[in-house]
């Protein structure tokens, strides 16, 4: 059930955020992330078409869907090069470099992901009648 929800949500987010990107490789894993203190995370592989998304397997349906949508915004940010990982824990977002001293809630890529996740969840619910 969870795997089907995740796969449907990933396909939906790609169609909403990146409909013309046909060469994305996204590997999704459901893991126990409770000890990490996160619901999920996304990281880039070899290039900006290769991504890994880890999701906490303990999340409920609504939490899981929200987390998938949030992480898929990060995939979109990286695939479009709006956000780039750099060395030493730094990220570039829209041409500006941020380091590890930037608080999580002040990171512009997180602000954007939180702002977009709700609309994606709502549209997914409407399209899939959940």
Language model features: what each stretch is:
Residues 1-46, 61:
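Auxiliary, metal-adjacent structural segments of Zn-dependent hydrolase domains
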């Amino acid at each position: 059930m969870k795997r089907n929800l995740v796969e449907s949500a990933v396909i939906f987010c790609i169609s909403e955020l990146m409909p013309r990107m046909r060469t994305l490789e996204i590997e999704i894993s459901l893991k126990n992330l409770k000890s990490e203190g996160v619901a999920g995370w996304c990281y880039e592989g070899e290039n900006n078409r290769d991504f890994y998304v880890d999701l906490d397997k303990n999340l409920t349906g609504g939490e899981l869907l929200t987390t998938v949508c949030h992480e898929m915004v990060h995939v979109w940010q990286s695939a479009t090069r709006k956000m780039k990982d750099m060395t030493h824990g730094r990220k570039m977002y829209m041409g500006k470099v941020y380091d590890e001293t930037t608080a999580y809630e002040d990171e512009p890529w997180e602000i954007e992901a939180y702002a977009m996740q709700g609309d994606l969840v709502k549209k997914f619910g409407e399209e899939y009648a959940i």
